[in-house]
Amino acid sequence: MGQKINPHGFRLGITTGWKSRWYADKQYAEYVKEDVAIRRLLSTGLERAGIADVEIERTRDRVRVDIHTARPGIVIGRRGTEADRIRADLEKLTCKQVQLNILEVKNPESQAQLVAQGVAEQLSNRVAFRRAMRKAIQSAMRQPNVKGIRVQCSGRLGGAEMSRSEFYREGRVPLHTLRADIDYGLHEAKTTFGRIGVKVWIYKGDIVGGKREVTAVAPAGAERARRERPSGTRPRRSGAAGTTVTGTDAGRAVGGQESAATNIGHSDDSVVTHEPQIAES
């Protein structure tokens, strides 16, 4: 089920929170309808604003709308004209006072919704879908908080007669793990031969006890020291042509030199040999 269900709904109340926060008894259906209308209004009027998320919170006589965007200048407009227009449209829709908060997204490459929008925009501009997917994966994996990403495109890819789905993945994306922090985004690209759906899953680590789990990183010096070859054990040509001394043989040669050096001045009986010794009965 982790492969099919929406990752946000699957982990709701465990690692993810609600995007609409309010309480209603008899007006529940009306509030849900208003929330859908608010999100649709913001998505259709601000396609190029890079809106990653919309959070709605209601009180008795006020509605607070938080817009997380990668381009706050487009949402605000010149001297705040665009923000005033959006606020007026929302007040007309809800018939209540609207508090509009515009928040900037610091790392748009690590937001699944923005990555999906970027891939869909490239597909609309006739960019090859494989190139767009790989470019999005490479830019996302450069972020320090991204541990895995999966990008999937579905539709008439490349203008083919039959629709199909293709995906690319890099890193870990554990969709069945509930404690995993999975960000999910979906967007549609409108092309001349139909619509292509773009889905993005981004894995940002595990959340244990309400805190993100930090994996210990080994120091670079220790890894470098482990990978370096011991001095004097470089593969060299010896014997017949085409034969090369292996790392095991070189290590044995160095071990024999060290044992001979430590036993200088002692009798030959104390020298350790690698030949098997048979105990006398």
UniProtKB/Swiss-Prot annotation:
Residues 218-281 are annotated as: Disordered. Residues 238-256 have a biased composition (Low complexity). One of its GO terms (biological process) is translation. GO terms for cellular component: cytosolic small ribosomal subunit. SMART domains: KH. Keywords: Ribonucleoprotein, Ribosomal protein, RNA-binding, rRNA-binding. Residues 38-106 form the KH type-2 domain. Coiled coil: none annotated. GO terms for molecular function: mRNA binding; rRNA binding; structural constituent of ribosome. Part of the 30S ribosomal subunit. Forms a tight complex with proteins S10 and S14. PANTHER family: 30S/40S RIBOSOMAL PROTEIN S3, SMALL RIBOSOMAL SUBUNIT PROTEIN US3C. Belongs to the universal ribosomal protein uS3 family. HAMAP family: Ribosomal_uS3_B. Binds the lower part of the 30S subunit head. Binds mRNA in the 70S ribosome, positioning it for translation. This is Small ribosomal subunit protein uS3. It comes from Mycobacterium leprae (strain Br4923).
